UniProtKB/Swiss-Prot annotation:
<feature type="binding site">
    <location>
        <position position="67"/>
    </location>
    <ligand>
        <name>[4Fe-4S] cluster 1</name>
    </ligand>
</feature>
<keyword id="KW-0521">NADP</keyword>
<dbReference type="InterPro" id="IPR004497">
    <property type="entry name" value="NDHI"/>
</dbReference>
<dbReference type="GO" id="GO:0048038">
    <property type="term" value="F:quinone binding"/>
</dbReference>
<keyword id="KW-0874">Quinone</keyword>
<keyword id="KW-0004">4Fe-4S</keyword>
<keyword id="KW-0520">NAD</keyword>
<feature type="binding site">
    <location>
        <position position="64"/>
    </location>
    <ligand>
        <name>[4Fe-4S] cluster 1</name>
    </ligand>
</feature>
<keyword id="KW-0150">Chloroplast</keyword>
<dbReference type="InterPro" id="IPR017896">
    <property type="entry name" value="4Fe4S_Fe-S-bd"/>
</dbReference>
<feature type="binding site">
    <location>
        <position position="110"/>
    </location>
    <ligand>
        <name>[4Fe-4S] cluster 2</name>
    </ligand>
</feature>
<keyword id="KW-0479">Metal-binding</keyword>
<dbReference type="GO" id="GO:0019684">
    <property type="term" value="P:photosynthesis, light reaction"/>
</dbReference>
<feature type="domain" description="4Fe-4S ferredoxin-type 1">
    <location>
        <begin position="55"/>
        <end position="84"/>
    </location>
</feature>
<feature type="domain" description="4Fe-4S ferredoxin-type 2">
    <location>
        <begin position="95"/>
        <end position="124"/>
    </location>
</feature>
<keyword id="KW-0793">Thylakoid</keyword>
<comment type="function">
    <text>NDH shuttles electrons from NAD(P)H:plastoquinone, via FMN and iron-sulfur (Fe-S) centers, to quinones in the photosynthetic chain and possibly in a chloroplast respiratory chain. The immediate electron acceptor for the enzyme in this species is believed to be plastoquinone. Couples the redox reaction to proton translocation, and thus conserves the redox energy in a proton gradient.</text>
</comment>
């Protein structure tokens, strides 16, 4: 009799459903309006890294005994250790030690298994360069201690702690 009546009812139901979905999305948007921003202004603000952060590797040349444990435990055989055997004292003398941070996966195995603790992880993570060959650090570059983020007065540090809801 009136074939258009069910179509109008179906259209009305779809309109109500669409309005409900829009309202749900709007409520989610309003719930996010009161939250603090998550982003930081990176070069001027930096997050304080955790105590166990695995950044650039620091190397102490005087402590190394050239045992090559770091090379054996590295999943990609990355550290290059050059040494010379001193026959009169029957010991290895370290000549050169280098790590290519363009290849390093920062797993920390070399630091963990080093018997003399001559390797350690720092909180330095800004290693970007325009030339990948500059990422190959020798023992002099690895021995340089980085400036602590907390001690740098030119930037504002932000503590990265989860918020406690009260």
């Amino acid at each position: 009799m009136f074939p258009m009546v069910p179509e109008f009812m179906n259209y009305g139901q779809q309109t109500v459903r669409a309005a409900r979905y829009i309202g749900q999305g709007f409520m989610i948007t309003l719930s996010h309006a009161n939250r603090l921003p998550v982003t930081i202004q990176y070069p001027y603000e930096k997050l304080i890294t955790s105590e166990r952060f695995r950044g650039r590797i620091h190397f102490e040349f005087d402590k190394c005994i050239a045992c090559e444990v770091c090379v054996r435990v590295c999943p990609i055989d990355l550290p290059v250790v050059d040494w010379k055997l001193e026959t009169d004292i029957r010991k290895k003398r370290l000549l050169n030690y280098s790590i290519d941070f363009g290849i390093c996966i920062f797993c920390g195995n070399c630091v963990e298994y080093c018997p003399t603790n001559c390797l350690s992880m720092t909180e330095e993570y800004e290693l970007s360069t325009y030339d990948r060959h500059e990422l190959n650090y020798n023992q002099i570059a690895l021995g340089r201690l980085p400036m602590s983020i907390i001690d740098d007065y030119t930037i504002r540090t932000i503590l990265n702690l989860p918020e406690i809801k009260t």
